[in-house]
């Protein structure tokens, strides 16, 4: 593998390298077999992992050679033997073949992505979920058009093969990939045989397919983002439109006099901002009405033609977002644009002007959150807390940990809002629901539970909340923090409530297209 990396770096035509002979390297399947054992050791019983089970690389080679045949490739996904030992051995060969195929395809993909990133050094992009919050504060309110696009998990097998065919010149190496994808589609229980439903399992093969597909989807926007990045520091047209521009003065881009005309011309291009999390992406465009209208019309058509989606164009769902509300990371955020008066003063007080601009003022959406809590049986439709009966079989620590995790994620996400009265109402609902759940489990009352547990209820969240609300700064900085908005984007994992809300939104979109 290291030699292949070195040859690919020295030779510019590394895309034409022959990948098919790599499928027959024993070292490759030794690595993939070790990966499979490491991944299955935590879930398989120890008696099933005895040393008597011999793994034959010759069998794997024969399976690779016969993979084009219908009766051999289907064994990769269908195991009919109920015996767990035989079933595990079949799965071992299947997983090794998939792991080996993934390792071979990852080599040219890693080289390709490395060269692509090195060629985009001038494009200062933020590749973290923490960049979503600055995007909502700085870019979202000042954009003319904001669209929410959902990339489907259901992808036709031929589309995946064609994405690899664009940058891999060795066509025989893609025949096993095509056979595996089509056999998986035929062996699945889905009624829609024209697509492949990528399962939400943590397998390296399907994760690699999904990452490669998303990489291709984002590649069509790279040239547009690179072009708009030259005027990113002046994206709003004037500094007063930034609330705290004195903190961002170091990011000012000074144009030279020689390139002044070219820089002014680049400011006429629309500023495009792109954010993606999972299968959802947000594109914000700022520019003239005519340019925004053209981008709204041509971007979906170009995406469909680029990925050969003209047979099912509805699978890429895109709709315009309202500036009064937005959704990211599976959460829902209500926005209020508040007018802000900004005074600008030149040197020696030669010129003083008052400018009125809009400020991003997020609000905690009480009604949608209460509705979501009622669907998950934490409260009724009016917001009265009830016990979570499905959790009464858990231990006390598990119940407290689950409620603590839900509240901590909600608090961290909505901590950037000015008005927190609604957020503390949500905390009251969750804390009382937790107390009722414990009381129902022990067949006691809430008063007895509170007396026994005391400060243990949401102890982690309360301590974290005090730490966030009272930072160890000076008195002047602490007073300023009371007036300013602070985003605490410490979200270790997505809230289960966010998944439930996202499923409801996706179901509404699918029902809309089915009508």
Curated annotation (Swiss-Prot):
It comes from Picea pungens (Colorado spruce). Usually encoded in the trnK tRNA gene intron. Probably assists in splicing its own and other chloroplast group II introns. The gene is matK. Belongs to the intron maturase 2 family. MatK subfamily. One of its GO terms (biological process) is RNA splicing. This is Maturase K. It is found in: Plastid, Chloroplast. Its main location: plastid. GO terms for molecular function: RNA binding. GO terms for cellular component: chloroplast. Keywords: Chloroplast, mRNA processing, Plastid, RNA-binding, tRNA processing.
């Amino acid at each position: 593998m290291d030699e292949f990396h070195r040859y690919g770096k020295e030779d510019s035509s590394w895309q034409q390298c022959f990948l098919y002979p790599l499928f027959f390297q024993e070292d490759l399947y030794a690595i993939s077999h070790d990966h499979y054992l490491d991944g299955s050791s935590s879930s398989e019983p120890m008696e099933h992992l005895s040393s008597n089970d011999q793994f034959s690389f010759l069998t794997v080679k024969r399976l690779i050679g016969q993979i084009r045949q219908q009766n051999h490739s289907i064994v990769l996904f269908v195991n009919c033997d109920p015996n767990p030992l035989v079933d595990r051995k079949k799965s071992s060969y299947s997983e090794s073949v998939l792991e080996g195929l993934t390792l071979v395809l990852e080599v040219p993909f890693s080289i390709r992505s490395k060269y692509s990133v090195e060629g985009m050094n001038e494009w200062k992009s933020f590749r973290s979920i923490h960049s979503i919050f600055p995007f909502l504060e700085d870019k979202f309110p000042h954009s003319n058009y904001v669209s929410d696009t959902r990339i489907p998990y259901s992808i036709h097998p031929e589309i995946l093969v064609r994405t690899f065919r664009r940058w891999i010149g060795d066509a025989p190496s893609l025949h096993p990939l095509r056979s595996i994808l089509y056999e998986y589609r035929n062996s699945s229980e889905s009624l829609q045989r024209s697509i492949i439903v990528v399962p939400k399992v943590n397998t390296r093969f399907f994760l690699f397919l999904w990452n490669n597909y998303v990489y291709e989807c984002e590649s069509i926007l790279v040239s547009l983002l690179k072009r708009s990045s030259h005027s990113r520091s002046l994206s709003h047209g004037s500094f007063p439109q930034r609330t705290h521009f004195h903190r961002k003065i170091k990011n000012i881009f000074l144009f030279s006099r020689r390139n002044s005309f070219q820089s002014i011309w680049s400011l006429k291009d629309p500023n495009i901002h792109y954010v993606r999390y999972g299968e959802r992406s947000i594109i914000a465009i700022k520019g003239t009405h005519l340019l925004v209208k053209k981008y709204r019309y041509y971007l979906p058509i170009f995406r469909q033609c680029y990925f050969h989606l003209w047979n099912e164009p509805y699978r890429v769902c895109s709709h315009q977002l309202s500036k009064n509300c937005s959704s990211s990371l599976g959460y829902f955020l209500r926005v209020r644009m508040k007018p802000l008066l900004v005074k600008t003063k030149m040197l020696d007080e030669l010129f003083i002007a008052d400018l009125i601009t809009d400020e991003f003022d997020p609000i905690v959406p009480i009604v949608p959150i209460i509705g979501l809590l009622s669907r998950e049986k934490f409260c009724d439709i009016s917001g009265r807390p009830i016990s979570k009966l499905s959790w009464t079989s858990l231990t006390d620590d598990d119940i407290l940990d689950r409620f603590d995790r839900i509240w901590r994620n909600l608090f961290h996400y909505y901590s950037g809002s000015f008005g927190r009265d609604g957020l503390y109402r949500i905390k009251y609902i969750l804390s009382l629901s937790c107390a009722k759940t414990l009381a129902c489990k022990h067949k006691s009352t809430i008063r007895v539970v509170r007396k026994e547990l005391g400060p243990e209820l949401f102890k982690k969240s309360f301590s974290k909340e005090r730490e966030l609300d009272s930072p160890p700064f000076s008195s002047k900085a602490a007073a300023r923090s009371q007036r300013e908005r602070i985003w605490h984007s410490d979200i270790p994992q997505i809230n289960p409530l966010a998944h439930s809300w996202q499923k409801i939104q996706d179901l509404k979109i699918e029902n809309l297209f089915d009508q």
